[in-house]
């Protein structure tokens, strides 16, 4: 890992430090869950208008998908910190499961050709 590509545990620590200094404290988990839904909605709006069939409004054109995805990640990291979830370990377990369970699953899928 490089400084430009930190492991998830470093991102979790960075969010925790920001919350405890600039943010004062974490919002309660249910508030963060609502905020996560809001941020995902902002991503959905961009996707529907920029990559889907909805027309993109002039006011939507300046919105940055990467910034909105980062907002989603920030709230996910907050929720992980609040619940004591080690996302680095959870990520590795999820990838191990996908690599073993889905190793050949998608190769014969005609929808992906």
Question: Residue ranges of each PLM-predicted region?
Answer:
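Flexible "arm" and connector segments at domain edges
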Residues: 1-69, 73-113
């Amino acid at each position: 890992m490089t400084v430009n590509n930190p492991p998830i545990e470093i991102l979790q620590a960075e969010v925790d430090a920001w919350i405890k200094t600039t943010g004062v404290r974490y919002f309660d988990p249910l508030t963060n869950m609502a905020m996560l839904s809001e941020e995902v909605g902002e991503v959905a709006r961009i996707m529907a208008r920029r990559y889907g069939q909805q027309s993109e409004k002039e006011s939507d054109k300046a919105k940055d998908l990467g910034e909105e995805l980062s907002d989603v990640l920030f709230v996910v990291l907050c929720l992980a910190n609040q619940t004591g979830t080690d996302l680095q370990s959870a990520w590795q377990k999820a990838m191990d499961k996908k690599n073993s369970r889905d190793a050949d699953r998608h190769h014969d899928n005609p929808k992906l050709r």
